[in-house]
Amino acid sequence: MDFTLSEEQQLIQSAAREFAQNEVAPIAAQFDASGEFPFETIRKAGELGFMGVEVPTEFGGAGLDAISYVLVMEEIAAADAAHSTIVSVNNSLYCAGILAYGSDEQRKRFVTPVASGQAIAAYGLTEPQSGSDAANMRTRAVLAPDGSHYVINGKKSWITSGPVADFMVLFAMTQPEKKSHGVTAFLIDCNQPGFIRGKSEPKLGIRASATCEIEFQDYRCPVENRMGAEGQGFSIAMSVLDSGRIGIAAQAVGIARAAYEASLQYARERRAFGSPIGSFQMIQQKLADMKCRLDAAHLLTMRAAWNKNQAKAKGLRNTLEGSVAKLFASETAMFCAHAAVQIHAGMGYSKELPVERYFRDAKITEIYEGTSEIQRMVIARQETGLR
């Protein structure tokens, strides 16, 4: 396992860092305050290949590997977590699933505009009453008598990019009696009748990534837009989340890195009792703990990405390594963001600096795409072979 970056990986890392620092960082506070969706910078991200890093060039993407995706996510997240959330959904949850389970025609129609940044995608799994509990999913898809389309009714909640999405991967129950084995995946055109965007969520962090509830009212989905076979949806969703968790781990590493770098600079410049506060042992201990956890989180995330590349070549899943990276990196982001606020003291509580935003943004990494509690359960089950 060699983490020496290839020339190609170094180039995309450099491009992502330049984009993040020059285009994203200067507007992050403004869009966090307003809660507006950053259409312009997301379009630019698409032009640079960041909205479809692992998508083949024939479908509008950059045609790179999982490590390249991790590098892009980390750089963008270090500038603004909200931007990286949008990038993550497009790459990990949407494009990855269609590339793995969709037909060539579905890839051309639904992946190409998203990977190129011309369209925005969403992922519809979570529901108001059951969260991501697929066995109790209430959204129903009923095949019409003539077999030409499905009629979909139900609600999805906490849909990232829902207010602005053009396309969605949706999971709905086609055979309720089979519980999780009765879930089917569909590709949804969000601009068709019966797709209703509900209330936007007033979130603690990642505020520029629009989030809302979606309702389906007699939405007609052509049968050719079903992805995979009937009843295959749950396995598709879990496989996609394996990949998505690596992206969230990279996002968490980016947030942690931003918090650490801000703390380093402040510790050097802020003076108290005649000395830089970085010379005080209590501050040094915090910085040392941040550095150790940050490096460990980064390496676990790189390992998960490397393993994903190997697993993909062999047609295997990458469940364990993705969950380990996501769990540790997300808790590292919270640890580093909390320490950064403490190091900055009163200024860490002020919106004049981005440190308080890092703190607010970090929390979601412990929640979405499987909470820390779920990750611990996944890891233990993978290791013991027990359920």
Provide a role label for each language-model segment:
Residues 1-83, 89, 101-106, 113, ...:
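Alpha-helical interface subdomain recognition
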Residues 49, 73-77, 172, 188-193, ...:
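Short Ser/Thr-interspersed hydrophobic loop/turn segments at strand-loop and sheet-helix junctions
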Residues 114, 129-132, 158-161, 175-177, ...:
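Short Gly/Pro-enriched turn/cap motifs at secondary-structure boundaries
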Residues 117-125:
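A short, Trp-centered hydrophobic/proline-enriched beta-strand micro-motif
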Residues 130-133, 148-150:
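Hydrophobic, small-residue-rich alpha-helical packing segments that form membrane-like cores
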Residues 136, 191-222:
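Flexible, small-/acidic-enriched active-site or ligand-binding loops
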Residues 139-143:
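A structural signal for short hydrophobic beta-strand segments in well-ordered beta-sheet cores
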Residues 148-197:
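A short core secondary-structure module
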